[in-house]
């Protein structure tokens, strides 16, 4: 037992001595490994953290932007400068089979080397030495990417130093990026010639396909071209491309006959509709104005079938009215709830030499009567009641410069309710309303509604602003018009589905709802438009039209609770329209757009109910006298329903109509005195006014008046309605610049053309005479 213990002790002692002898060696190995590890870490740090500006710039470079519609269908690819196409796709968007083919063709061991392949380098070096020239390369995918990031100079000779530099850059890339990211960058940057870079753009430009639609033959073909785009071109050198493709195909058991190969890889040209360019250009400018880089992919809410319908409608109408010299059309449709643009047609024909490239959605036009709803909205905001009666009679406004508005049909309709004045688009009530509200107040309100084109135009703005004489864009007009179905909220226009923007309440909810009620009232429209079938939709809708600038601008606005539409027709090259054309043309297009969007939903009962415009909450519809706007008395022959603010109901109940009275047993109308001359010209019976007979005199115009042409109305329909009163007999004769304009009996009314310059008027009645002068500017 003791001997065994002694033997074990000796053995342990010997082992201890051996360990002591090995300790210096172990320490040396550890030190060497530490040094090697430190060197490797240092080298890695140098490669990883040393400045690599070319890579930094490369990662930030701009790519072609792909625009998709609301169904994720590609509608346009925006090229870079000088027409270069370079679409960018993430590795997840690139089919695995396509990745595999490129790895087989270029770098089988890509995922297993640090950026360079030692075996390939030795092989290439041996072959090059044997041939005494460079006949073989050893470039990995990472080295090729390094060459793309830092391109060789065009005349630089390829030497061992050139290759060494690319190898070092490849290592720098490998230390900074993952293998998947390197492959992704490589596949998106490969040169294919003809201003095409990246497999995504190559697939589209060679085969008019998305990457996931490529056949195996086409995938292999794309892997062949980048090595030498010209040499392996399937168009110029089909034999070369076929031979190389078969080399790659053999490695994946793919074989095909040459004639089948040529057929399966036939080039198909990609064509995008140029009419999309107006919208695309606007989007790019929006990003540019905000100093933002446009993303590689933009998902729009564009409804492509709707856009095609609009383009067809515009072209058809322009062909029908081609003899009127109307050459351009534009349309815009937005979704009220979101502010998304669902259709933008900037011009009916982008290739039209007559200003086809000009975008009618953002070019400025006179709006005509299409802006009148905003004037009446401001009136409601200021407390003017919906029951207010407007005098649609000859009037002039202003001081030194007298502004004389005319109705489009040169008729005057006497007292009219606010809803009729707006729905029938009467001019004189609108001008009187602006005169009372003030131009500054209205201009400020329009700017608040997003009419930024009006900035800086106040000095040259007069009362004709009520009739839309100032220039604005269709984009501003459609966006602003959407506040009415949107309960007074002005939505920011959304470019894509990701943007989130703030909205603004510009008018009260009830104001917006009342305007919708006015504009959807078909009976109220009848005075100005008759029974216009174009406005009679099967669903709740509102319309407002406008013509201006000698019919050079014809506009229609339309909306449902869900959508707002704007259509413009006219000439962008400044040519004058030679025939009278009505706003019913764009109104018909707008109606067809709303039908497309809304009629399919009418089959759903719950949806049909949701299409109705909401009613104001702080107002109650009450019976009023249709003529006076007051509470009807027992003599009022006609009553209508109109909104009265709840807080004013008691006051309204006490304001009974005083216009309709019984006189000598018969119903008589006691018009206010301002209607005296209008009533006298209507050949009406059963009325009374405070008529005062005086010596012959002009009631209109006044002596020394200055008239200004209204650009919103064609020159040939602008006339001055001359009115006189008094005299000893019921017959008078008018002389205009010394020329007789004929006799008038009972009613002393004449119409003379509005002609520039100084003019004189003289009236003779028995032995009385009166003369005045006026100026037309």
Where on the chain are the PLM-derived regions?
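N-terminal type II signal-anchor transmembrane helix
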Residues: 2-70
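Soluble, non-transmembrane domains of envelope/secretory-pathway proteins that act on or interact
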Residues: 12, 25-26, 68, 250, ...
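Non-catalytic, structured segments within soluble enzyme domains
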Residues: 37-44, 133-308, 312, 444-447, ...
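Active-site SXXK
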Residues: 102-103, 252, 256, 310, ...
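Short, well-structured active-site flanking segments
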Residues: 111-121, 197-200, 259, 380-399, ...
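Conserved catalytic neighborhood of penicillin-recognizing serine enzymes
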Residues: 130-154, 271-289, 337, 384-442, ...
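Active-site loop and adjoining helix of the penicillin-binding protein/serine DD-peptidase-beta-lactamase fold
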Residues: 174, 226-244, 294-306, 352-392, ...
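A penicillin-recognizing enzyme superfamily signal
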Residues: 300-323, 332-335, 344, 351-363, ...
């Amino acid at each position: 037992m003791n001997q065994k213990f002694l033997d074990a002790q000796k053995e342990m002692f010997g082992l201890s001595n051996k360990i002591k002898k090995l300790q210096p060696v172990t320490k040396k190995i550890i030190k060497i490994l530490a040094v090697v590890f430190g060197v490797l870490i240092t080298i890695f740090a140098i490669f990883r953290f040393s400045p690599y500006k070319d890579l930094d710039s490369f990662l930030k470079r701009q790519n072609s932007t792909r625009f998709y519609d609301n169904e994720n269908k590609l509608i346009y690819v925006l090229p870079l400068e000088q027409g270069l196409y370079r679409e960018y796709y993430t590795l997840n968007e690139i089919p695995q089979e396509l990745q595999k083919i490129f790895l087989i063709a270029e770098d089988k061991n890509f995922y297993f080397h640090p950026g360079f392949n030692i075996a390939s380098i030795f092989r290439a070096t041996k072959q090059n030495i044997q041939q005494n020239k460079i006949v073989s390369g050893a470039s990995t995918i990472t080295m090729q990417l390094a060459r793309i990031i830092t391109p060789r100079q065009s005349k630089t000779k390829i030497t061992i130093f050139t290759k060494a530099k690319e190898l070092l850059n490849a290592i720098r890339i490998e230390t900074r990026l993952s293998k998947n990211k390197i492959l992704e960058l490589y596949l998106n940057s490969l040169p294919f010639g003809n201003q095409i870079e990246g497999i995504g753009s190559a697939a589209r430009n060679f085969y008019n396909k998305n990457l996931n639609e490529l056949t195996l033959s086409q995938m292999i073909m794309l892997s062949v071209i980048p090595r030498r785009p010209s040499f392996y071109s399937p168009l110029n050198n089909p034999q070369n491309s076929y031979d190389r493709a078969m080399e790659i195909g053999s490695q994946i058991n793919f074989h095909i006959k040459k004639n089948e190969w040529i057929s399966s890889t036939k080039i198909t040209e990609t064509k995008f509709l140029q009419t999309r360019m107006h919208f695309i250009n606007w989007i790019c400018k929006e990003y540019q104005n905000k100093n933002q880089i446009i993303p590689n992919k933009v998902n729009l809410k564009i409804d492509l079938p709707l856009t095609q319908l609009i383009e067809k409608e515009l072209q058809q109408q322009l062909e029908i009215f081609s003899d009127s010299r109307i050459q351009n059309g534009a349309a815009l449709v937005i979704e009220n709830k979101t502010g998304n643009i669902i259709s933008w047609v900037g011009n009916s024909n982008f290739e039209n030499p007559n200003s086809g490239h000009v975008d009618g959605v953002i070019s400025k036009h006179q709006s005509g009567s299409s802006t009148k709803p905003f004037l009446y909205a401001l009136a409601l905001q200021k407390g003017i009641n919906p029951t207010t009666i407007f005098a649609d009679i000859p009037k002039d406004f202003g001081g030194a410069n007298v502004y004389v508005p005319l109705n489009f049909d040169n008729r005057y309709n006497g007292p009219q309710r606010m809803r009729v004045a707006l729905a029938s688009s009467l001019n004189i009530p609108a001008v009187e309303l602006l005169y009372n509200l003030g131009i500054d107040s209205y201009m400020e309100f329009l700017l608040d509604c997003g009419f930024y084109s009006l900035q800086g135009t106040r000095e040259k703005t007069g009362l004709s602003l009520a009739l839309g004489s100032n220039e604005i864009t269709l984009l501003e007009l459609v966006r602003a018009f959407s506040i009415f179905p949107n309960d007074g909220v002005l939505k920011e226009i959304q470019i894509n589905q990701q943007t989130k923007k703030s909205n603004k309440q510009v008018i009260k909810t009830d104001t917006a709802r009342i305007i919708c009620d006015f504009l959807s009232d078909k009976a109220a429209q009848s005075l100005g438009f008759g029974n216009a079938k174009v406005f009679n939709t099967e669903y709740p809708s509102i319309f407002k039209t406008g013509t201006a600038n000698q019919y050079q601008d014809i506009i229609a606005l339309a909306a449902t609770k869900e959508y707002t539409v704007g259509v413009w027709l006219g000439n962008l090259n400044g040519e004058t329209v030679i025939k009278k054309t009505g706003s019913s043309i764009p109104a018909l297009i707008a109606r067809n757009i709303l039908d497309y969007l809304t009629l399919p939903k009418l089959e759903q009962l719950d949806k049909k109910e949701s299409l109705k415009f909401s009613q104001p909450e702080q107002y109650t519809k009450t019976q009023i006298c249709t003529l006076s706007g007051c509470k009807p008395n027992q003599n009022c022959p006609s009553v209508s329903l109109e909104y009265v603010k709840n807080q004013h109901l008691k006051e309204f109940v006490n304001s009974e109509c005083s216009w309709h009275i019984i006189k000598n047993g018969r119903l008589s109308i006691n018009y206010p005195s301002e209607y005296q001359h209008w009533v006298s010209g209507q050949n009406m019976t059963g009325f009374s006014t405070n008529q005062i007979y005086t010596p012959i005199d002009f009631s209109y115009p006044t002596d020394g008046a200055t008239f200004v042409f209204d650009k919103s109305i064609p020159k040939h329909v602008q006339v001055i309605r001359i009115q006189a009163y008094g005299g000893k007999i019921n017959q008078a004769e008018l002389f205009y610049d010394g020329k007789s304009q004929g006799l008038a009996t009972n009613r002393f009314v004449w119409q003379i053309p509005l002609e520039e310059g100084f003019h004189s008027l003289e009236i003779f009645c028995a032995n009385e005479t009166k003369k005045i002068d006026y100026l037309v500017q």
